[in-house]
Amino acid sequence: MSTSALRSILRPSFAGRVSAYGRRTMATGAAKKEWLAIMPDKANVLEIRKKVKPIHYEGIKPLIASGTLPAGGAIFEKHPVDGEPAQFKGSIVVYSAETAEEVREIIKNDVYATSGVWDLEKVQILPYVAAVREPLTK
């Protein structure tokens, strides 16, 4: 057997398992896609947001652990400054799900939605493909 033939046997092949965007895909189950969700806050909901924030964080832990919520956070009118109250504008989240409808259901069940923080009529769910993923700190 030639050296090149032996190398091709020993070298792992990702052919057929990597999409055009460099993401590994699996042959079983429906393919999940990423969605960018923008959830604006309703007016004058800062106190409600603060009150339910711990419940929100507990509620998203399973979504993070399962990979359904790989990234997310608050959006602001301007960057927060120490000593000044933050001017929240809403939330932005990347979800991994099969459909936009699945994402909408996750959003509707979040405590920020059920307590009236997010304006569900103005939620945007957009198809999303990440080109770069880097941790905040290295």
Could you describe each region identified by the protein language model?
Residues S2-L10:
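Fungal secretory targeting signals
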